[in-house]
């Protein structure tokens, strides 16, 4: 793919400011141009940062990477056209790979949407309100089994947009916004589910070949130069097949077939909230305690299967509290993984969290430095170990788990397709059933990488 450098420079907003500087002296022009440039850059960067901050998971990481690339290209362009061209040529593959994210950032940078920010703002006040309306229209179309612009509300919306803009809108764009926002808001509800990288899948089963151990290189003497032994011994590794799969998760709601469209439209935010919360609860619960039967196998189950269930001195009756030293002992069970602090996360029950608050080693989020990476739902740190709280541990009792330490890089969250809405007509009950479905799972590459702590037996 060939990149048009001039077009890219234009999209990056690198035009001149001549029209704004007419009637000024040379010194004034220079000063005013610098002020306007800085002001413009600050506004543009704020808009792009806002777009990145609203994204979650893998989308956010790709947007962050694209944002750094855009900043780099900006800097190179300011220095010289030749340097800019050389940078584009060197990073052509990266630019092509992130082209969708770059387009989104540049659109946000200019304050535009696919129907024009001015139109969205004129009709709904803000872009966020506009997208809320778009989401309702798409969900309503699923409920009514009509096209996005075939419902009464959809027709009125299309008419209003057409009167305000010459841009032709498509239902596909609206459905994309709907799907992205549903996933975004669902992921915001997750704590444990937000810890792991997502693995996009296009089929029910994905097979991956991996090498468990890297093997060792060979030290060779200088005297072996020119012989076969100068390249060292062959590194022999046994490849292992890993099969990734997903489980279907569905949340259901009902609406009677006599309900009018206006009434349904008013209830859509409530319907949406209920379905999202139902999905979040099920994912969090399964990722902690799932048994692998029709649902993901949870972290506590995996720790038990690995014989990595450590009995601690902490007692369920509260006579011996959970302490930082208690948690530190669990890391020993992780072996070499326990040394990689930046890749570990501690998940604790609510009771264990309140115990740790009394520990002198506890750092709440206000004490964690701004340069530290904070996880979604993070409440603090223990010995530098990030801590999140889950309410889906077993009830507090003798021998019950209260904490789990997980090596994040060993786990992945397979996802097949996006969130979908399905409808089922139940004629005998005179109602329609609506399902919000997605296919996800929690899997790991290799055994181990997780350890749980339990209260004492008595």
UniProtKB/Swiss-Prot annotation:
Keywords in UniProt for this one? Capsid protein, Coiled coil, Late protein, T=13 icosahedral capsid protein, Viral capsid assembly, Viral release from host cell, Virion
Q: What is the effect of changing residue 353 to C?
A: Confers resistance to Pycsar-mediated defense, reduced fitness compared to wild-type phage
Q: Look up the record and give one Gene Ontology term from the biological process aspect.
A: symbiont-mediated evasion of host immune response
Mutating residue 45 to P leads to what result?
Answer: Confers resistance to Pycsar-mediated defense
Residue ranges of coiled coil: 21-110
Spell out the InterPro entries in the cross-references.
Phage_capsid, Phage_capsid-like_C
Site-annotated residues for Cleavage: 159-160
Instruction: Name the Gene3D superfamilies on file.
Output: Major capsid protein gp5 (3.30.2400.10)
Q: Which GO terms describe its cellular component?
A: T=13 icosahedral viral capsid; viral capsid; viral scaffold
Query: Looking at the record's lineage, which domain of life comes first?
Result: Viruses
Q: Which family does it belong to?
A: Belongs to the HK97 phage major capsid protein family.
Cited NCBIfam families: major_cap_HK97
According to UniProt, the name of this protein is Major capsid protein
Species name for this entry?
A: Escherichia phage T5 (Enterobacteria phage T5)
Taxonomic lineage per UniProt? Viruses, Duplodnaviria, Heunggongvirae, Uroviricota, Caudoviricetes
């Amino acid at each position: 793919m060939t990149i048009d450098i001039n077009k890219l420079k234009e999209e990056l907003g690198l035009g001149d400011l001549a029209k704004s500087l007419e009637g000024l002296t040379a010194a004034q022009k220079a000063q005013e141009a610098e002020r306007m440039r800085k002001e413009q850059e600050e506004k543009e960067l704020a808009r792009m940062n806002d777009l990145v901050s609203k994204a979650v998971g893998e989308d956010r990481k790709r947007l962050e990477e694209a944002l750094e690339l855009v900043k780099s290209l900006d800097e190179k362009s300011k220095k010289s056209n030749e340097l800019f061209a050389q940078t584009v040529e060197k990073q052509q593959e990266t630019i092509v790979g992130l082209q969708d994210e770059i387009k989104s950032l540049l659109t946000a940078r200019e304050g535009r949407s696919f129907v024009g920010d001015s139109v969205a703002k004129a009709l709904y006040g803000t872009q966020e309100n506009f997208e809320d309306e778009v989401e309702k229209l798409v969900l309503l179309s699923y409920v009514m089994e009509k096209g996005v612009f075939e419902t009464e509300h959809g027709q009125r919306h299309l008419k209003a947009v057409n009167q305000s803009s010459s841009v032709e809108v498509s239902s596909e764009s609206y459905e994309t916004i709907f799907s992205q926002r549903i996933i975004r808001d669902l992921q915001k509800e997750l704590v444990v589910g937000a810890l792991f990288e997502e693995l996009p899948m296009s089929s029910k089963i994905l097979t991956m070949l991996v090498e468990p151990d890297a093997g060792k290189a060979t030290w060779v003497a200088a005297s072996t130069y020119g012989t076969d032994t100068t390249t060292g011994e062959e590194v022999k590794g046994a490849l292992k097949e890993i099969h990734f799969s997903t489980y279907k998760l569905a949340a259901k709601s009902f609406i009677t077939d006599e309900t009018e469209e206006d009434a349904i439209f008013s209830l859509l935010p409530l319907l949406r909230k209920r379905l999202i919360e139902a999905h979040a609860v099920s994912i969090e619960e399964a990722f902690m305690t799932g048994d692998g039967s029709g649902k993901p196998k949870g972290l506590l189950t995996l720790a038990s299967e690995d014989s990595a269930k450590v009995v601690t001195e902490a007692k369920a009756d509260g006579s011996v509290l959970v302490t930082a030293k208690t948690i530190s002992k669990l890391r020993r069970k992780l072996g070499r993984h326990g040394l990689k602090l930046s890749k570990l996360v501690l998940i604790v029950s609510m009771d264990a969290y309140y115990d740790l608050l009394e520990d002198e080693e506890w750092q709440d989020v206000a004490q964690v430095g701004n340069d530290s990476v904070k996880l979604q739902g993070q409440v603090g740190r223990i010995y530098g170990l990030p801590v999140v709280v889950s309410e889906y541990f077993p009830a507090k009792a003798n021998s019950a788990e209260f904490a789990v330490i997980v090596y994040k890089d060993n786990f992945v969250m397979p996802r097949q397709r996006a969130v979908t809405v399905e409808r089922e007509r139940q004629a005998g009950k005179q109602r329609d059933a609506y399902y919000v479905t997605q296919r996800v799972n929690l899997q790991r590459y290799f055994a181990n990488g997780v350890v749980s702590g339990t209260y004492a037996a008595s």
